[in-house]
Amino acid sequence: MALDLAGHGFDVAVHYRGSAEEAQATAQDCADLGARTQTFQTDLSDEAAARALLPTVVQAFGRVDAVVNNASDFEYDNPASFSYALMERQWRANTAPAIVLAQALHEQVTARGATGCVVNLLDQKLWNQNPDYLSHTLSKAALEAATTMLAMGLAPAVRVCGVAPGVTLLSGAMADGEFERAHRMTPLRRSSTPEDIARAVRFLIESPAITGTTLLVDGGQHLAGQPRDVMFLARQNAQEM
C-alpha cells in the first residue's frame, strides 16, 4: 500500500511498532519512487502514544490528508478458549487506535478547512463467519461498525471507508502449500494480492463521493460459506488428497 501510494504521487508516513528495519526499507522504497517519506515508531495499544502519532506526523510533513489503518494483532482463540485478556489485546491493537487516528485526522483537517479520508483494513470473514480467531474477528467487527459510525459523525470533513481482504499473505502457522491452496478456495479461484488491496485503498482515498462503506476484495471468498478458518480447511484438504 505504501509503495502504491508513493508511486501515485503521495508522500508517505510509515508507522511501525517493532519492525524498524522493515519500516526503513519500505520508506526507502517509497523515496526511490519519488515520495517524501519518514518512519514513525509508536505502540498504538498505548492510548497516549496513539493520540500523539498524527500530530507528530503533521509536525514533520505539514499536513495529513489520509490515514490507512492497517496495524493489526492476530492471535488465535475460539469460543472455548476466549479470555478477557486476549480480547482486550485485540481491541487495543485492532479497534481503538483506528478510532483515535480518525479523531485526530478530523481535528487536523477541520483546523485548516480541508477534507480527509480514513481507510480501515477489515476482513472478509465478517461476511463469512466461523468460530476461529474469535477475539480478532470481534475486534474487526467492531471496527467495521465504527467505520459506519465514524463516517456519519466525522462528515463532511472526513470520509471513512473499509477494505476487507481475503487470503493475501502468509499468516499464523500457515505453510506455503497451505497458503497456495487457501488462496484458490474462492469462487474466482484466486483471493486477493497485496497489489489488489493497495489499488482498492487508493481508489477509496481518491473517490470523494464514497464514505461509510466497505469494499470486499477477496476473490469472492465471503460467498463461500466456510465453516472454519481457511488455513484449517486448506490443511484438511491436503490431508485428504
What spans do the regions from the language model cover?
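Amphipathic alpha-helical dimer-interface segment in Rossmann-like NAD(P)H-dependent oxidoreductases
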Residues: 55, 89, 93-113, 151-156, ...
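C-terminal substrate-recognition "lid" of short-chain dehydrogenase/reductases
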Residues: 194-217, 222-223
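Catalytic loop of short-chain dehydrogenase/reductase
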Residues: 73, 110-155, 167-168
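Conserved mid-core segment of classical short-chain dehydrogenase/reductases
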Residues: 51, 73-89, 107, 111-112, ...
